[in-house]
Amino acid sequence: MARSAAIERITKETQIKLSLEIDGKGEAQICTSVPFLDHMLDLFARHGLFDLKVEAHGDIDIDFHHTVEDIGIVLGAAFKEALGDKCGIRRYGNAVVPMDEVLASVATDLSGRPYLVYNVQLPKVKIGDFDVELVREFFQGFVNHCGANLHLNLMYGDNVHHIVEACFKAAARALDQATQLDARIEGVMSTKGKL
């Protein structure tokens, strides 16, 4: 059975079409009108080995906030839908990723209980036209609609582009680990019997 989802979300602020294949090859087709986010989603797909297609249009003439946050929302919802009842998944995942002078870590639990711990101190700057404070908004939208507990930690580093890139790569690798099927797991990885 394919673990995939296709979601379309239309609001007065954004129009987003997204498809996700969890058991993919890391292929991506991304067009969000936010070039830096395109880059982050492309490497997210590649390092998580997810096949991901995103087409988004938003009120970027105002700023990128709604578009970035809403893509996080839709991506989280796609993971939730694709995982279904979560039978057989490992549930937990973690990754520590270096990017030159940066080291970032992510630990995740696909528990159904959304919670974001975001220990990433970034200066209030832009990478191109992209406000780096939107990285948190993206991940908050993601966890809220995926039902994931995500701990994102910057251990050290200076270059803001490298920091954000390491965070997205670590998140992808942790989610790849957590979504893996394990033949030894009967039902769900919980003593409650439900996630």
UniProtKB/Swiss-Prot annotation:
Q: Which organism is it from?
A: Geobacter sp. (strain M21)
Q: Which residue spans traverse the membrane? A: none
- Name the reaction it catalyses: D-erythro-1-(imidazol-4-yl)glycerol 3-phosphate = 3-(imidazol-4-yl)-2-oxopropyl phosphate + H2O
Which terms are listed as keywords in the entry? Answer: Amino-acid biosynthesis, Cytoplasm, Histidine biosynthesis, Lyase
Which GO biological-process labels does this protein carry? L-histidine biosynthetic process
Q: What class of enzyme is it?
A: lyase
The pathway to which it is assigned is: Amino-acid biosynthesis; L-histidine biosynthesis; L-histidine from 5-phospho-alpha-D-ribose 1-diphosphate: step 6/9
What start and end residues bound the annotated signal peptide?
none
Which GO terms fall under molecular function for this chain's record?
Answer: imidazoleglycerol-phosphate dehydratase activity
EC numbers, comma separated:
4.2.1.19
Reply yes or no: does the keyword Ribosomal protein apply. no
Tell me which PROSITE patterns the record gives: IGP_DEHYDRATASE_1, IGP_DEHYDRATASE_2
Localization, per the record, is: Cytoplasm
The entry's protein name is Imidazoleglycerol-phosphate dehydratase
Q: Which GO terms describe its cellular component?
A: cytoplasm
Fetch the PANTHER family from UniProt: IMIDAZOLEGLYCEROL-PHOSPHATE DEHYDRATASE (PTHR23133:SF2), IMIDAZOLEGLYCEROL-PHOSPHATE DEHYDRATASE HIS7 (PTHR23133)
